[in-house]
């Protein structure tokens, strides 16, 4: 059975007019992992705990949550998303991340998809996933999605092929990697719609840079859904007083 994954995770903010929303990549360069706790190295040169990072975002009225696209793992064919424009829009939504663990997992997914993390950082994040205790179903879906994305990044970007990594890599990613190395032009042309060898050797985990089978950019489709439902998107959670002081659960 194909696994369901949460992809296309980006910060959702209102623009300066407060009439529209925009999606933004996280301003994170690296993570530090200590057991089941995460610290983030930001683009501004700061080292902050996940609770502090969440508190900073929730204290701004512009932050609404995290975008999400719900995909079966084989629907991301690396070079495109195997959905029509209409079906894609029915898979888009927003995640409130109403507790620290959900927020942390959304941040991890977003950074693995959209940031250039080192191999060591990716392995540290796997250790973090092993350390956290996820009890409810949506948290387990976030946890599962994060693990599959991290293992996919290690497999595609660093060519790690250990069984404990490959078992979490979607089959389409494995086929794509094999195609890149064996130059099977027939597979490249008809399955992945690649027209040249240079295209076969360039790829990204950024879902919003993909196009649907109709040629529509996923990022634009996601924005269309969010703006069509704004301002009726769910509100971000209220912070308990101790979180506003930067304390963790």
Swiss-Prot record:
<keyword id="KW-1035">Host cytoplasm</keyword>
<keyword id="KW-0946">Virion</keyword>
<dbReference type="Pfam" id="PF01677">
    <property type="entry name" value="Herpes_UL7"/>
</dbReference>
<comment type="similarity">
    <text>Belongs to the herpesviridae cytoplasmic envelopment protein 1 family.</text>
</comment>
<dbReference type="GO" id="GO:0044177">
    <property type="term" value="C:host cell Golgi apparatus"/>
</dbReference>
<dbReference type="GO" id="GO:0019033">
    <property type="term" value="C:viral tegument"/>
</dbReference>
<dbReference type="InterPro" id="IPR002600">
    <property type="entry name" value="Herpes_UL7"/>
</dbReference>
<comment type="function">
    <text>Plays a critical role in cytoplasmic virus egress. Participates in the final step of tegumentation and envelope acquisition within the host cytoplasm.</text>
</comment>
<protein>
    <recommendedName>
        <fullName>Cytoplasmic envelopment protein 1</fullName>
    </recommendedName>
</protein>
<keyword id="KW-0920">Virion tegument</keyword>
<keyword id="KW-1040">Host Golgi apparatus</keyword>
